[in-house]
Amino acid sequence: MMHFSFRHTSLADIDFYIECFRNDEFQYMLYHNDPINVNNLERYIVKNDKDIKFVGSIIDESGNLKDVGFAHFYFKEENAYTYVGGIHPKYFNHGYGVYASIAMLSLIYDLMPNIKISTGIYKHNLRSLKSDLAIGFTIIKETNEKWILELTKENFNNNFVGRVKLKIKYQLSNI
């Protein structure tokens, strides 16, 4: 069984975020619409308002850290959030992306069952589109450069997600 541990971001994560920001492509992909850089990163990490920001760890059966990532849910309107997330470039993608997404989204829906979550996927990233559609996202809009997808709890509770949930354990940690 794969173990996922999530916690709210704090200033203890500053080095993790600085490492992420050293990767130009990674920084652009996640934050090109936000005026965030290393200079105001501390304020960004601790300023949550209605946003929800998590750092997640994937731990194997022996207790070894396998992957580190983050997921940010930006408040749009009541019961609606926009989601961005990523894996730390240093540990980039051991093949756990779908498992991590399902663990994170399961936790979010446990905490806030009525929310809708949207995200955008660039058209060159067909692999991400395929996995998000399997999770239950549906395409609600298309632009020249990307698809906009939305997820509800009803669509998330599908057979594929159910099978994956049997293979994972997730928790919210205070650490």
Where is each model-derived feature located?
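Conserved GNAT-fold acetyl-CoA-binding loop/helix
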Residues: E25-Y44
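A short helix-loop-beta-strand connector motif used in the catalytic cores of GNAT acetyltransferases and
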Residues: I45-S57
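Residues that form generic nucleotide/phosphate-binding pockets
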Residues: C20, M29, Y44-K47, K167
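Acyl-donor (CoA/ACP) binding surface of acyl/acetyltransferases
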Residues: M1-F16, C20-N23, K53, D60-I175
